[in-house]
Amino acid sequence: MFTLKKPLLLIVLLGIISLSLCEQERNADEDEESETKRGIFTKINKKKAKTGVFNIIKTIGKEAGMDVIRAGIDTISCKIKGEC
């Protein structure tokens, strides 16, 4: 019985050591991935901010342009009808 305990104990100890080494490597990989993700997200957030600003400018430009067109149409229709 004692002869079976030594190899079993050795296997358990080697398993624990390998698991702890794997866990350390996994933690290091997770740290690297989180830093990479932070870098990616800041780039994405900057792009979204730029896109948001451009969309706002574009919307304001469209509304201003439509107001000018409406005013021009009103002026032309007024002159055509002779009501001005």
Curated annotation (Swiss-Prot):
The keyword Hydrolase does not apply. GO terms for cellular component: extracellular region. One of its GO terms (biological process) is defense response to Gram-negative bacterium. Disulfide bonds join C78-C84. Residues 1-22 form the signal peptide. Expressed by the skin glands. InterPro entries: Antimicrobial_frog_2, Frog_antimicrobial_propeptide. It is found in: Secreted. Keywords: Amphibian defense peptide, Antibiotic, Antimicrobial, Cleavage on pair of basic residues, Disulfide bond, Secreted, Signal. Its main location: secreted. Residues 23-36 form a propeptide. Belongs to the frog skin active peptide (FSAP) family. Esculentin subfamily. Antimicrobial peptide. This is Esculentin-1Vb.
